[in-house]
Amino acid sequence: MTTGVDSERPGAGAHGGSEAFPDDEEVSRDAFEVFRDDWGIPHLRAADALALARAQGYVTALDRAWQLETERHRLLGTSASCLGAEAVDWDRFVRRARLADTARRCFGRLAPETAAWVGAYVDGVNDGLAEGASRAPEFASVGRAPGRWEPWTPLGVWLSTHILFAGFPTKLWREEVADRLGEDRMTLFATDGPGTAGSNGWLLSGERTASGAPLLAGDPHRFIEAPGVYQQIRLACPEFDVVGLAVPGIPGIAHFGHTGGVAWAITNAMADYQDLYRERLRRTSDGGVEALGPDGWYRAHAHTETIEVAGADPETVEVIETDRGPVIIGGPGGDLGDALDGDLGGALDGDLGGALDGGSGGGLGGAPGGGSGGALDGGSGGGPGGDPGEGSGGDPGGGPDADSSAEGHRAISLRHPPRVTGALGFDVLPALLRARTVADLDTALDRWVEPVNVVLAADTAGGALHRVAGHVPVRPDVNRLRVVPAEDPAYAWREGEAAPLPRTEAVGPGGIAVMANERGLAAPLGVEFAPPHRARRIRELLGARTDWSPAAMADVHTDTRLASSRPLLSLLAWAPGLGPAAERLRDRLLRWDRHMDADSTEATLYARLRTDVVHRLAGHPALQGVTGADDPWRSAAYPALFRPWLAAVPRIGYALESLLTVGLLPYEDRLALVAASAEAVAAAAEETPPAPWGELHRLSPWQALPDRPSDGSDGSDGSDAEAIRPGVAGDHDCVLSTSGVPGVTDLFARGPAARYVWDLARREDSRWVVPFGASGVPGSAHHRDQTPLWARGALVPVVTDWGLLHPTTRHPEENPAMTAAEATTAGPAVPALRAAVHEQKVEGFGTVRLVPVDPSADVDLLHGWVTEERARFWGMGDHTREQVREIYEFVGSLPTHHAYLALRDGVPAALFQTYEPDADPVGECYDVRPGDFGIHLLIAPAEGAGAVKGYTDALLTAFIGFVFRDPARLRVVVEPDARNAKALARMVRVGFELGPEIVKPEKTARLAFLTREAALRLG
């Protein structure tokens, strides 16, 4: 058995993949080398791609043996055999969905070279499992040895990992909402919800980077598992040399990689490509099962399987498959009950196309196929497209049982592309490793199947890519929205057809492309998308600089601005009749910068207020049909596995922003509800002051078996709370999306499952981090050594120099600390640290610097200035912080208008705004001359030693110096409020000539002008 070859020379071979093994060494074609960096991350070299795949499987078995065993059991539906009764629900679903059978089918249809490559990976897994299991204490805990992997096992792992990824159980929730609240409320709760997984990703062209080459960065958001769902790895052979984030159990690098020539990343497209069909089933006299299809009753495939349960009796599950797909809910015995036999069944018998009218289908957009009518026409003549397996094919069987209803019992089947087509997209994986350009990558992705992703990519030759990849079937739009009747041919898939996949210009004129699961490129393919806040915020942050570097990307990864707080805080601002404590709470939250920072007690207060509002909404009569005793979560009609999608309180929490703005409740009721919550939260805060957000907002990862108490050998301080469940910043709709369940818990299980920065200038300047470490073995030095870095947003370097790596198949014993430059990121934006657009020393006053306004970082400062009584002529005295921020975001978006802070010796002293009069409403009030240049001034109060004589005139000297340093500017225009006598007198004193009064919508102003000649005379 060939395992690995330890290198005798750490620096042997070149850095590129073309010299993976030195020419003067004779090595077996099966041989490989395992190197590790200081973080235990494996770097693998082999003589060819097959040996490299074997190496990848082998090292994954060493590092993640228990994780691989867990995944193998999950795809087979045998988890309960070692984890007990709590795993039965999953096992039952996997058996009924026939995931293992689908994996076998898809493996059988792989290209021969791909099948050999996957087989080599499996050989490596089997080679390494015994040693890996000897290191992993979990095997002893459950008294099991690892099971052997089959060639098709990786495909099954991929299926089981992603089968719930597209969120088909949400269709069950929509049916419940339609039945209980009405058809027009079906999409009331539409938003990024309990079962979805998303990501951030962004691409910067060279015009926005310090190196002049593209940067690609982001972070996938998934349920965080320990060990992690991503594995940092490097794969090198003569054909390629790739770094990236692999999925343990899957060969190659599917989602995030850098080949040296091209880098790519993905986010969930939020597409809908899995359908649920309402089936009618009946038992035959010989014990078989019949299903009702478009052509009448026919014999369906049916067999039974046994689920072994540790510590309990085994269970028997009946596996049924119709022409649509495997039955996952209900059966011929009627166990689905009233949920589909009663009113809901009646709703499904009606005109489903009507769900697209009257607003409930507004999220579907222009779906492929030319609307539901075109899809209906196309589907009616097509066959079902599935291969339900043995026992199908229309055999009438033994006829209906005398005790069975002639109409049949209700059930639900699942139809998804791999089961129908026998393709899972694994032929793409080796092609990704060999890609050298965006064109190579694009061609490979044409064969991608699932999950359906949005892809960003860039190469070193200047190419870029922004597209959707995956298989979305062509069928009626309504299939995406709800459960549809199996016997009606109108709802069939168009056999052999796939929806066209959108693509767009990779990088726009601003040099920025963003993907964050929003309703954007993939809008025609889905129903529910993430709110736009993350995408907007990322664009805002990236647009603020043109010198981005890999290290600076962490500033974006860790941004905590919570834009979705606006509706709730707006209602709080106007909540009537608050008591003193609630007034103090309101004042505090309205002054809050809306950043969910770990050290913020205001963030905690906001979270408490949000939770209380969620529960009050859940108790409101408007939602009583889906809450309390009527909560679909309590229904016995559906398997317990689907309860996260059916629980009302989390649905309300995730959709709170829209529920507080749509017409669900009258405005007065919303105000009263928020006022009541404010009183309750304020009273609690008076009694128990809030803790910092990071003390409550802790990671709660999923683990098949909990860790043993830490003794500090894993690199932690011995504290399980901090080593396993660190407190971090962020929230559901922040760029730093650490998502708890609003209204249920502040703990979070979904968040950045990795972070990456791919540098197209120098791959060795790329960076990455995962929540835990390279090793899944408790007690290893690299089990959780990246957790502190991940928690604070730091990244570790991607090492590409073989000479800096450790040639071993074992983890290095020591983990040297990172340098400060490697482990820290830039702090918050401080005005004094920003690059100045103008700097001028004013004699007797100090140095005046003009720096751009950062609307988010400066909002407290600006709001404080513009709402003071002395600034009443500025016209923003009653504005909220959010309104002030939005105004200056808008100003910053205009090429003709700019806002600056004037700093006197580093201290903010004034707000200085400039504009081009012919691009401003003031230009309509007078005859604009060539060279006119408008300014607005708001001087901050000077206190203490700063209150020197001539303070304002000194600042004006610097402002005028800035304006007239451009020879194209011939005249300064100001327009103070006509009532502001002090400002007018000041302008005259420094040389302005008064012009006429003008009437603007917000004020009557007096124009004043300062020519270049007059300014020179003053100088």
Whereabouts are the PLM-identified features?
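Conserved catalytic-core motifs of GNAT/GCN5-like acyltransferases
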Residues: 916-918, 975, 993-1007
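Conserved N-terminal entry element of GNAT/NAT acetyltransferase domains
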Residues: 818-856, 1017-1019
